[in-house]
Curated annotation (Swiss-Prot):
Chain sites annotated for binding [4Fe-4S] cluster: 347, 408, 411
GO annotation (BP), single: L-leucine biosynthetic process
Keywords: 4Fe-4S, Amino-acid biosynthesis, Branched-chain amino acid biosynthesis, Iron, Iron-sulfur, Leucine biosynthesis, Lyase, Metal-binding
Protein name per Swiss-Prot or TrEMBL: 3-isopropylmalate dehydratase large subunit
Entry EC number(s): 4.2.1.33
Record Pfam families: Aconitase (PF00330)
Length: 467
């Protein structure tokens, strides 16, 4: 019987299935960070248990770490306590951790693939919703809650029911000036933030195959913003080449065996999905969100929508609230919206290709006078090192951008990098909810190139014609 990629990954990890469909699923890789792990470790200790498989765990502090003056430590006492607690728990149980000043430290969803700790065919979980990122590598990856973190530590399994399957097929050559971020924002604009609810999404088609592995990670990262718990892409030669020489990747005969298995990780011809969405890449343009949800998104050459034209009462009310929070007026051209801050980073867009794309735009230019701060935050110490080797840091610094240490940074207001009330930010992150980047902060989601262009122009511009 023909199987989808999701079917194959799921079936390979079912340990036991109950009559109601509840399955015990084996977990291959468990990624830990400082925010959702303390209570899980505490529960483990109170029950007198040890981690079932220590080597399956990999930890890193990312949410709370400072991106400036790191040698001075963490100023906020709660943030410092969470990081110290992770350090202590990993030392206690012998779990590998990349500590704050380790070159390998970074955002958990960047360092997992970077190290080869995430591999095709794995089940990968983390106490973070954007774990879906790892599905770009042909893995079944999803976020879990703190109680589930404890359960995985103790048993290396989870109890759950299989989701429905959805295929989002994107065909055609990606237009000039458009990136993986524009692809996924365009998709969310079509299906909405609830479109994938209850489904595991496989992204497929010639456009997806044409993306780099890092671009595919950007797409799968935001599967959760489309309502799905997990997103995935079939394995191909790009995937396999990505893992050659990674520290945690198999070597020798084991590599050959692994590659043989990895090449089976695709949906079979004739496999049936519960829902199929077809997207024409020719319709994609550089995207900008205008509201307080990722589905409130438009092409950069569009205008802020007018709620009076919306017939649905609930949607109209949501639009009115979003416009009030964002301080925008209906029918305003998106290119007329000025920005106060620019953030290039996050688990969505902080990899080396993202920084290269932003640097191409920033080269030889200057951040606009009305932009109070433009910051670039690499996704890991190794990404930062590579960028500096290529001279990208100098391009950004000479243009007036701040060059920071790796971490989650301004993606969320859990560290020193945050917006002040009323500040408007062009951000390469994944969520534009009210207060996401700081109380009263106004977030517009864009690609790295679009963010860099906004920093230089002082307002949103169409990167396709920006000079």
């Amino acid at each position: 019987m023909a199987q989808t990629l999701y079917d194959k990954l799921w079936d390979a990890h079912v340990v036991h299935q109950e009559s109601d469909g509840t399955c015990m699923l084996y977990i291959d890789r468990h990624l830990l960070h400082e925010v959702t792990s303390p209570q899980a470790f505490e529960g483990l200790a109170l029950a007198g248990r040890q981690p079932w498989r220590v080597g399956a765990n990999l930890a890193v502090a990312d949410h709370n770490v400072p991106t400036l003056n790191r040698a001075q430590g963490i100023e906020d006492p709660i943030s410092r306590l969470q990081v110290d607690t992770l350090d202590d728990n990993c030392a206690k149980y012998g779990i590998t951790e990349f500590r704050m000043n380790d070159l390998r430290q970074g955002i958990v969803h960047v360092i997992g693939p970077e190290q080869g700790a995430t591999l095709p065919g794995m089940t990968v979980v983390c106490g973070d919703s954007h774990t879906s990122t790892h599905g770009a590598l042909g893995a079944l990856a999803f976020g879990i809650g703190t109680s589930e973190v404890e359960h995985v530590l103790a048993t290396q399994t989870l109890l759950m029911k299989k989701a429905k399957s959805m295929q989002i097929n994107v065909e055609g050559e990606l237009p000039f000036g458009c990136t993986a971020k524009d692809v996924v924002l365009h998709i969310i604009g079509i299906i909405g933030t609830a479109g994938g609810t209850g489904h595991a999404i496989e992204f497929s088609g010639s456009t997806i195959r044409g993306l780099s592995v890092e671009g595919r990670m950007t797409v799968c990262n935001m599967a959760i913003e489309a309502g799905a718990r997990s997103g995935m892409v079939a394995v191909d030669d790009k995937t396999i080449d990505y893992f050659r020489g990674r520290p945690f990747a198999p070597v020798g005969v084991l590599w050959d065996q692994a590659v043989g298995y990895w090449r089976t990780l695709h949906s079979d011809a004739g496999a049936r999905f519960d829902r199929v969405i077809n997207v024409d890449a020719r319709d994609i343009k550089p995207q900008v969100t205008w509201g307080t949800s990722p589905e409130m998104v438009l092409p950069v050459d569009g205008r802020v929508p007018d709620p009076d034209r919306e017939k649905d009462d609930v949607r109209r009310s949501g639009m009115e609230r979003a416009l009030e929070y964002m301080g925008l007026k209906p029918n305003t051209p998106l290119v007329d919206i000025r920005v106060d801050r620019v953030f290039i980073g996050s688990c969505t867009n902080s990899r080396i290709e993202d920084l290269r794309a932003a640097a191409v735009v920033a080269r030889g230019k200057r951040v606009a006078a009305n932009v109070r701060q433009a910051m670039v935050v690499p996704g890991s110490g190794l990404v930062k090192q590579q960028a500096e080797r290529e001279g990208l840091d100098k391009i950004f610094i000479e243009a007036g951008f701040e060059w920071r240490e790796p971490g989650c940074s301004m993606c969320l207001a859990m560290n020193a990098d945050r917006l002040e009330p009323g500040e408007r930010c062009a951000s390469t992150s994944n969520r534009n909810f009210e207060g996401r980047q700081g109380q009263g902060g106004r977030t517009h989601l864009v690609s790295p190139a679009m963010a860099a262009a906004a920093a230089v122009a002082g307002h949103f511009v169409d990167v396709r014609s920006f000079r």
